């Protein structure tokens, strides 16, 4: 076996008809966790339904349908392997809650793969003012996905097929607009592919002898290659934020007979260890962690990315809840936010948003109404430059700096310090109307909170 490969998360973005499903389906199909039997079954069904020409997307559609019906599919189906990495596709748009998932998502994507269609008229539709391509790329960048790969898809349907001229034209245009967003095109591999026929997906295509390969230049080291698979191998693996103080947003709290109160959640930053004295915010309760476990096995430490349950002493299941944040009481313990300043981008709101607007904010696992108390300035969404002070209102497409006040006690952090606790989705009318990143947080100076007996003991012993 040797050493396990590093795990990488990618998000696949692009216009609705760019061929995202076919492309991802192809990778999963050829390098992935779908066993031969399932593939044969899918192929047979696809053929019977006259969808033979659609088999890769069909595989993905089947998986998506199962996912949407709430059947949790074997997640290995969304994984595939490259020579260096295990890659998980954490989400692909087209999914109703894609934007919300991308923000509150259980995991941050390490890289975005942008698929653009090269077919006649298709590229133009995707990149036009109201195309989704720009929106998705902007979102990815705003939410901290700083690595990008571009697949120029459907090269088989250009005029003439596999046209170098068309490819060059698209690369030029996409480079210009990802640059406006903030990506540096020199660090972005561009690959001409056909997700359907398989050109340049896993190996060099004989249909594009003119394509000499892609190159990236960056301080971490230059790279080059030909296929999309090779481009995925150039992704720089994430550094786990173990050196930051602990932040663990609670997903649930269970009461387990014979054990007691067991909060469950994912370590976002720092390390959780048994014996540690932790503080829960915004409730301001401090107690000792007795044990930590993952998949029913006791751990001596839990690291960022680990979903764990941990047993806490002298705390009732009524005291803490989903959306609370657990941290180390000795290292920058989490606190309730009195208010926070955010950079917000309005995505799709039918009317005008003015001061006083109070939608629900989804930030990490918290789901709380917050008031847009003050619209401080309207800014250019790409450069961040100020356009006007104290705008009267905001509409779709606008970006602004906004002062926000939670309607109920809530714990959030600045994006620069704790990224997963500093990005949020604004939900209204059953959709994501805006996204935001938190610039700074004014903490509520809490009085003395509740410190349990076991915490006092542990603190004394630790002195």
From Swiss-Prot:
GO terms for molecular function: GTP binding; GTPase activity; protein kinase binding; translation elongation factor activity. Residues 5-242 form the tr-type G domain. Residues 70-74 are annotated as: G2. It is found in: Endoplasmic reticulum membrane. Found in a wide range of tissues. InterPro entries: EFTu-like_2, G_TR_CS, GTP-eEF1A_C, P-loop_NTPase, T_Tr_GTP-bd_dom, TRAFAC_GTPase_members, Transl_B-barrel_sf, Transl_elong_EF1A/Init_IF2_C. The modification N,N,N-trimethylglycine is found at residue 2. It is an enzyme of class 3 (hydrolase). Its EC number is 3.6.5.-. Residues 444-463 are annotated as: Disordered. The modification N6,N6,N6-trimethyllysine is found at residues 36, 55, 79, 165. This is Elongation factor 1-alpha 2. The modification N6,N6-dimethyllysine is found at residues 36, 55, 165. Residues 91-94 are annotated as: G3. The modification N6-acetyllysine is found at residues 179, 439. Homodimer; arranged in a 'head to tail' dimer configuration. Gene3D superfamilies: P-loop containing nucleotide triphosphate hydrolases, Translation factors. Residues 194-196 are annotated as: G5. GTP binds at residues 17-22, 153-154, 156, 194-196. Residues 14-21 are annotated as: G1. Trimethylated at Lys-165 by EEF1AKMT3. Mono-, di-, and trimethylated at Lys-36 by EEF1AKMT4; trimethylated form is predominant. Methylation by EEF1AKMT4 contributes to the fine-tuning of translation rates for a subset of tRNAs. Trimethylated at the N-terminus and dimethylated at Lys-55 by METTL13. The modification Phosphoserine is found at residues 163, 224. Its main location: endoplasmic reticulum.
């Amino acid at each position: 076996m040797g050493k396990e490969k590093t795990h990488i998360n990618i998000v696949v973005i692009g216009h609705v008809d760019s061929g995202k499903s076919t492309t991802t389906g192809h990778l999963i199909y050829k390098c992935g966790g779908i066993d031969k039997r399932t593939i044969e079954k899918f192929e047979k069904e696809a053929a019977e339904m006259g969808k033979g020409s659609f088999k890769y997307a069909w595989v993905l559609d089947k998986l998506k349908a199962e996912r949407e019906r709430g059947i949790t599919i074997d997640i290995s189906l969304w994984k595939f392997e490259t020579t260096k990495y295990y890659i998980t596709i954490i989400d692909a748009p087209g999914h109703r809650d894609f934007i919300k998932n991308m923000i509150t998502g259980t995991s941050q994507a390490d890289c975005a793969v942008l698929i653009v269609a090269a077919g006649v008229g298709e590229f133009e539709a995707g990149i036009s003012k109201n195309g989704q391509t720009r929106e998705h790329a902007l979102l990815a960048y705003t939410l901290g996905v700083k690595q990008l790969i571009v697949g120029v898809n459907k090269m088989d349907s250009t005029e003439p097929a596999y046209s170098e001229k068309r490819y060059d034209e698209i690369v030029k245009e996409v480079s210009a607009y990802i640059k406006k967003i903030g990506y540096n095109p020199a660090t972005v591999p561009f690959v001409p592919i056909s997700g359907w026929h398989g050109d340049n997906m896993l190996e060099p295509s004989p249909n594009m002898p003119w394509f000499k390969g892609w190159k990236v230049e960056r301080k971490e080291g230059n790279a080059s290659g030909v296929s999309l698979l090779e481009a995925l191998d150039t992704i720089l693996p994430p550094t786990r934020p173990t050196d930051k103080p602990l932040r663990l947003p609670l997903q649930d709290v269970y009461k387990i007979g014979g054990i007691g109160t067991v909060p469950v959640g994912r370590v976002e930053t720092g390390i959780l260890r048994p014996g540690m004295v932790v503080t829960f915010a915004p409730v301001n309760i401090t107690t000792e962690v007795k044990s930590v476990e993952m998949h029913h096995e006791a751990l001596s430490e839990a690291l960022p990315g680990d979903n764990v349950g941990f047993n806490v002493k002298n705390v009732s299941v009524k005291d803490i809840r989903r959306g609370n944040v657990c941290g180390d009481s000795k290292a920058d313990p989490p606190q309730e936010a009195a208010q926070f300043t955010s950079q917000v981008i309005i995505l799709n709101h039918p009317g005008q948003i003015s001061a006083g607007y109070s939608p629900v904010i989804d930030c990490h696992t918290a789901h709380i109404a917050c008031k847009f108390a003050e619209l401080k300035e309207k800014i250019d969404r790409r450069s961040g430059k100020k356009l006007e002070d104290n705008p009267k209102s905001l509409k779709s497409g606008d970006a602004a700096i906004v002062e926000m006040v939670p309607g109920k006690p809530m714990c959030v952090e600045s994006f620069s310090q704790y990224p997963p606790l500093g990005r949020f989705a604004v939900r209204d009318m059953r959709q994501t109307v805006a996204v935001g990143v938190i610039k700074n947080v004014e903490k509520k100076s809490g009085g003395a909170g509740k410190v349990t007996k076991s915490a006092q003991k542990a603190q004394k012993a630790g002195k």
